[in-house]
Amino acid sequence: MPKMNYFFLRCLGILMLLIWTATLALAQVSLKTKQYLLLSGPENTASHQFAEDLAEIWSMPGVSFGSDLQPVSVVDGATRLKQMRDQRGHLAIINGQEAWQLLPDHPQVKVVSVLWPNVLYLISRLQPPQIVPLTAARTVRAPLQALEVVRAWDEQSPVSLLQETNWFRQEETIQALEGFKEDVFLSWGSYPLQEIRALLNFPGYYLTEAQDTLQKVWTQQLPWTRSYTLPAETYAGQPALQLLAEFPVLVVHETVPDSLVNNLLRSLFGHAESSNPRFLFRNLSPQHNLLFQQKLPYHPVARRFYRFP
């Protein structure tokens, strides 16, 4: 009987030791897990969806290396950058105009990558050929986010387009598309979009590109934009089109470790090049960063990743 008690106590001791070791290991893992706040737009925005997708990709085995990305919705880019300045955010997605205009005032924030292209859709009710001449449109329907686009166009137009524009909020795009009667409908968006495809099925609506002169005016006056080729057959029967594009920008606070920035870049483009990337990752390309290498304050790790001079 004493031998059995000794054997039982020895087994119990070994079991307790194993439990204590496992608990200690879990505690060490927990202590090593660092949470990074990724600031994006409100729900139902593309930047919010991208942040959610990136956080899920980051949580996959072998990606995060002991860290978590936590998406946080913040109303606009200016507020996101302010929170990063106050160390209440580690990463953020802001739009191209915000990056161009606001980053010089936030030297502690650096660019990791430009993201997917948001093209400027021009849906015309004017007759083909499918190019919107500089002076053709008399009435426009556009989101408030396209104010600078319409203002630059207005300066070249014989009519006051600013006064003849019916404005809507970007999140109201689907409702604004329904039965619009203006000459031209403008909207920023990724591609392909189901609502654009549905509209183009109706006769009398054409996906168009702007006249070269107007495109040049836009790229000169809106330096955060670039001309972008929408591939042929993105929408049925559509030829390749030269559209205006704006790229959202992923930025990071300088206190974030270089190793995380490096893993982030590899995760972004690794998923983009996978066999089944998520929607907003499909049009990511490292090459897009070449368009902005002299214009935006890139993180040193990103500059090496893109092989900037």
What are these regions (language model features)?
Residues G96-A99, E155-V249, T255:
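Pocket-lining segment of extracytoplasmic ligand-binding domains
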Residues P2-L12:
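Bacterial N-terminal signal peptides that target proteins for export
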